[in-house]
């Protein structure tokens, strides 16, 4: 019991850490201008390979990646199809995350990430048969109230919001169901995604010349790869260590950070109505935090 609580606590800390890094990643599309969102996505995938390998080799080694391919996935066509569908899913989400801030879809993406945890929690209950505690139900109801207000206030639902909240949960839940190791899984994902990205970069002569001529890209692009590698591996690892319901509520940290970045960095104005969206979500996070403290005391 004590070991299980230790793993859950570690998963919660990893999830919070990864959500904070996702907030930083959102800024890279702005810092790397005049590169387009698609350019930033392609460079992110290529530089992330090196970041992931820097984590992989000193910790679990290259054999673990080979073991994923030969043993975990093996000769099962079903598992390979499910894995590759997840890879396509992840690739589309990575592209959308970098493309949205520069194409007027920032608010819609934030809405998608607000709905994402709710869909995760419902699917975790329906697909993985995870039970929700009373406190977790209260937290999810609070979060749902905030999201419902935002939907009522904006009265819009774009394709970008729909793509994030309905498609992205499949990636996390399928990997958890298949018991794919987090670091090895995301490394194989990025290797596969980087192949078309490499072809794309080679076809963009203007982008290549810009990156080679401006020294700031020599620092920003490696930083993009390292931050991406750490955030994604930590996030996927945490999703496998904690119940989906807790992971769902903690996932609200990212859209809240995106909101704060929009207000304090991008100078977007906050209205009184916005508080009716964000205060219930903040309260849901506090409720989950209280449950974690209570469970820790019970173990002691």
Curated annotation (Swiss-Prot):
It is found in: Cell membrane. Signal peptide: none annotated. GO terms for cellular component: plasma membrane. Keywords: Cell membrane, Membrane, Transmembrane, Transmembrane helix, Transport. It is a multi-pass membrane protein. It comes from the Bacteria. NCBIfam families: rarD. Belongs to the EamA transporter family. This is Uncharacterized transporter HI_0223. It comes from Haemophilus influenzae (strain ATCC 51907 / DSM 11121 / KW20 / Rd).
């Amino acid at each position: 019991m004590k070991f299980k609580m230790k793993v859950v606590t570690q998963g919660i800390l990893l999830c919070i850490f990864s959500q904070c890094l996702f907030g930083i990643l959102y800024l890279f599309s702005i810092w790397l201008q005049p590169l387009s969102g698609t350019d930033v996505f392609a460079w992110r995938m290529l530089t992330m390979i090196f970041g992931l390998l820097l984590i992989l080799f000193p910790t679990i080694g290259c054999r673990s990646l080979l073991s994923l391919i030969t043993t975990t996935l093996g000769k099962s066509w079903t598992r390979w199809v499910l894995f590759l569908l997840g890879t396509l899913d992840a690739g589309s989400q990575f592209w959308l995350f970098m493309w949205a801030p520069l194409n007027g879809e920032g608010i819609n993406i934030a809405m998608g990430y607000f709905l994402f945890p709710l869909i995760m929690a419902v699917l975790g209950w329906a697909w993985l048969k995870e039970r929700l505690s009373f406190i977790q139900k209260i937290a999810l109801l609070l979060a749902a109230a905030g999201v419902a207000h935002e939907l009522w206030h904006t009265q819009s639902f774009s394709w970008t919001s729909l793509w994030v909240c309905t498609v992205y949960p499949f990636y996390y839940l399928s990997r958890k169901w298949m018991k794919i190791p987090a670091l090895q899984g995301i490394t194989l994902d990025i290797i596969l995604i980087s192949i078309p990205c490499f072809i794309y970069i080679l076809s963009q002569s203007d982008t290549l010349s810009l990156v080679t001529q401006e020294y700031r890209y020599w620092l920003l692009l490696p930083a993009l790869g390292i931050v991406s590698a750490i955030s994604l591996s930590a996030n996927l690892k945490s999703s496998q260590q904690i119940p989906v319901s807790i992971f769902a509520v903690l996932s609200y940290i990212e859209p809240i950070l995106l909101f704060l970045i929009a207000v304090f960095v991008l100078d977007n104005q906050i209205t009184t109505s916005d508080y009716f969206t964000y205060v219930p979500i903040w309260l849901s996070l506090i409720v989950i935090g209280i449950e974690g403290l209570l469970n820790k005391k019970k173990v002691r």
